[in-house]
């Protein structure tokens, strides 16, 4: 094992995560229908600051992400600053790393803290699958540009006459990889076939996720980290995730047909995470700044790692690649972890990554190591359920996982937790957290 890379400031301060919060997560076109991501971001950051009782001017930087970009608000981070009563001079910029976006936001704020340019910042993300940037065809877009330059009505009519009916149809955001044309579900099907993951195994994992998430809500474990929201027409509060199927049975999962490979596939809507709306954020600061403000941190950021692999085959293996690097940089092994939380984009993807983490062959061929990263103990894995149950607002999931894991570590008396996610483009992210 290489030498650990401690995440500390020049003064030796650890990177403290003092609080975290999220909105409830809503299935597409339900509770947050019509609410853009920027408004969801304002909701969560405004409430996070109000609950923390941290002076607004103590926050020196806000890094926020949004995967499904809205042209009218390209820098969501700055709009959140301007829309929440934060100091107008607060530095703010936006990031995007697909499903690992808020992992990236957290890393960026941590790096600013370690560089000494700030002492406190907010990181997070928001996405809406209900408010989408519906575009126009390339043919229509080109004609519209040319029409603006045309000088006569005749020239304009000539340009429009070149269009076909199909050119006038709206164009929704792409759901496939730009470089390959593959959808995420296509990749999940690849992984199921490559690693011999059955439909029954996928359905069992999905059922486990929903059961554990339902239990977490029933036991009140999520109440402190999920805010109550009010949206137009402001008649009813929305306080709990609405995708969780606590009453489902395994037989219910078996009824669904494959969603991607309809003839030979095993990936269904039930063993995949749904399109979701929501936002999440965390406050980070140096350990000494937290003490100055009289705050007890939820925990500390021990290490992080980002990786990238090829996109043509089994590209959602990011956790299997990033987890060993994050553990190495933290100076830990799999056995040292109290909790292990993996983003469940698809049950097939999750099970494939778990399989490779326990594979000596994978460790030897990819990392040149004699031993596997380690089997993930089921008693430590996604103990409160995962994204299949909660949903997945792309840019918000990382912040949800970090906050959820730190709260659970605190309930268990402290220890180390690892959170990890795959992301489009063959990307992966992992972070090691510590709670006392």
Swiss-Prot record:
NCBIfam families assigned: AcCoA-C-Actrans, FadI, PRK08963.1
Residue stretches spanning the membrane: none
Name by which UniProt lists this protein: 3-ketoacyl-CoA thiolase
Gene Ontology process terms (BP): fatty acid beta-oxidation
Alphabetically ordered keywords of this record: Acyltransferase, Cytoplasm, Fatty acid metabolism, Lipid degradation, Lipid metabolism, Transferase
Tagged with keyword Lyase: no
Species of origin: Salmonella typhi
Main location as per UniProt: cytoplasm
One GO CC term on file: cytosol
Pathway annotation from the record: Lipid metabolism; fatty acid beta-oxidation
Pfam families (UniProt xref): Thiolase_C, Thiolase_N
Phylogenetic lineage: Bacteria, Pseudomonadati, Pseudomonadota, Gammaproteobacteria, Enterobacterales
Subcellular compartments: Cytoplasm
Keyword Lipid metabolism carried by entry: yes
Gene from which the chain derives: fadI
Function: Catalyzes the final step of fatty acid oxidation in which acetyl-CoA is released and the CoA ester of a fatty acid two carbons shorter is formed.
Subunit details: Heterotetramer of two alpha chains (FadJ) and two beta chains (FadI).
């Amino acid at each position: 094992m290489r030498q650990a890379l401690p995440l500390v400031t020049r003064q030796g301060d650890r990177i403290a995560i003092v609080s975290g919060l999220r909105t409830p997560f809503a299935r597409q076109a339900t509770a947050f229908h019509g609410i853009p991501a920027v408004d969801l971001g304002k909701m969560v950051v405004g409430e996070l600051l109000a609950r923390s009782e941290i002076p607004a001017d103590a926050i020196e930087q806000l890094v926020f992400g949004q995967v499904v970009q809205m042209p009218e608000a390209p820098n969501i981070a700055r709009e959140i600053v301007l829309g929440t009563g934060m100091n107008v001079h607060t530095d703010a910029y936006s990031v995007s790393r697909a499903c690992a976006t808020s992992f990236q936001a957290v890393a960026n704020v941590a790096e600013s803290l370690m560089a000494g340019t700030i002492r406190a910042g907010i990181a997070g993300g928001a996405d809406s699958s209900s408010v989408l940037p519906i575009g126009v065809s390339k043919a229509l877009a080109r004609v519209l540009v040319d029409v603006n330059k045309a000088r006569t009505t005749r020239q304009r009519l000539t340009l429009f006459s070149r269009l076909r009916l199909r050119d006038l149809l709206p164009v929704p955001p792409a759901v496939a990889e730009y470089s390959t044309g593959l959808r995420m579900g296509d990749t999940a099907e690849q992984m199921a076939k490559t690693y011999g993951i059955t439909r029954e195994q996928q359905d069992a994992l999905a059922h486990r996720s929903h059961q554990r998430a339902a239990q977490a809500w029933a036991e009140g474990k999520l109440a402190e980290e999920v805010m109550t929201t009010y949206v137009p027409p402001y008649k009813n509060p929305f306080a709990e995730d609405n995708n969780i199927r606590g009453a489902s049975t395994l037989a219910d999962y078996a009824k669904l047909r494959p969603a991607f490979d309809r003839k030979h596939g095993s990936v269904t809507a039930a063993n995949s995470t749904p399109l979701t709306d929501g936002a999440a954020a965390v406050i980070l600061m140096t350990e000494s700044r937290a003490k100055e403000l009289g705050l007890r941190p939820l925990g500390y950021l021990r290490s992080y790692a980002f990786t990238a692999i090829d996109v043509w085959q089994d590209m959602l293996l990011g956790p299997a690649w990033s987890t060993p690097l994050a553990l190495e940089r933290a100076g830990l092994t799999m056995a040292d972890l109290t909790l292990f939380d993996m983003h469940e984009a698809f049950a097939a993807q999750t099970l494939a990554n778990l399989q490779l983490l326990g594979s000596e062959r994978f460790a030897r061929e990819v990392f040149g190591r004699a031993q596997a990263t380690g089997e993930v103990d089921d008693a430590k894995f996604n103990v409160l359920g995962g994204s299949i149950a909660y949903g997945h607002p792309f840019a918000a999931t990382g912040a949800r996982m970090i906050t959820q894991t730190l709260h659970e570590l605190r309930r268990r008396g402290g220890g180390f937790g690892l959170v990890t996610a795959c992301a489009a483009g063959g990307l992966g992210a992992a972070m090691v957290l510590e709670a006392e």
